[in-house]
Amino acid sequence: ATYWPEIQRICDKYGILLVLDEVITGFGRTGNMFAATTFGIKPHIITIAKGLSSGYQPIGGSIIHDEVFNVVAEGGELYHGYTYSGHPVAAAVALENLRIIQEEGVVEHVRDVAHPYLAEKWHALADHPMVGETKLVGLMGSIALTPNKATRAKFASEAGTVGYKVRERCFANNIIMRHVGDRMIIAPPLVIKPAEIDILMERAKKSLDEAYKIVKDEGLFVAG
C-alpha cells in the first residue's frame, strides 16, 4: 500500500516521469478501471493494450497526462506512426468492449462481488503445506510455493522446477495457472461468478495436493 506512493514521491521530487505499464492491470483487473487508482498514484503515462479489447482484437495505446502532451504538442507535428495505427476493426471492437465494461458494471463486479468472494477462499490456501504466502489484488492473485512455511525458504531444486509440476497438475485438472519460478499466478475472467470461483478453488486445491505428493515422492520437498 505504501510502495507505489513512495515511488511517486521520489519521481516527483527529482522531476522523473512516472510511466505505468497497465497492459495487464488496466480496465478492471485490480477492481478499479486502472491500477493507478487502486494504488493511489497519478502517472504521467499509462500504457494499455489487451484489456482495451478484452483480447478480442490486437490493439494498444498510451494515455498521456496534459503535462507531457502539451510539451509534445508545442513541438509541432510529430512525424512518427505505425503500420497498423487506427485499424478500424480493432478500434470498433475496443469501443464496444468499453461500452460493455461500463454499461454492464464489469469493474464494479470485480470490486464488489468477485474479489471479496475469491479473497477469502484464495487466502485460505495459505494453510496448504506447500504454500508460504498468498496475494490477491482484484482478480490477480499469486501463491508462493515453499518447502518450509515458517521461513518461506526456496526449494533446493532449480527455480521453477516445483512450480512447473504444480502447473502441470493444474492443466490436468482443467485450470489455467501459470508459474513464474515457484510462484503460481491466476487471473480469472473479470465476469467470473461465485459458483465458478468455487470450481476454480476446488481444482486449485486438488492440483496443489497432487503436486505436493509428487514433489515429496521425487525428493524435491527440500529447502535450498
Region annotations inferred by a language model:
Residues 1-224:
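Conserved N-terminal phosphate-binding loop of PLP-dependent enzymes in the Aspartate aminotransferase
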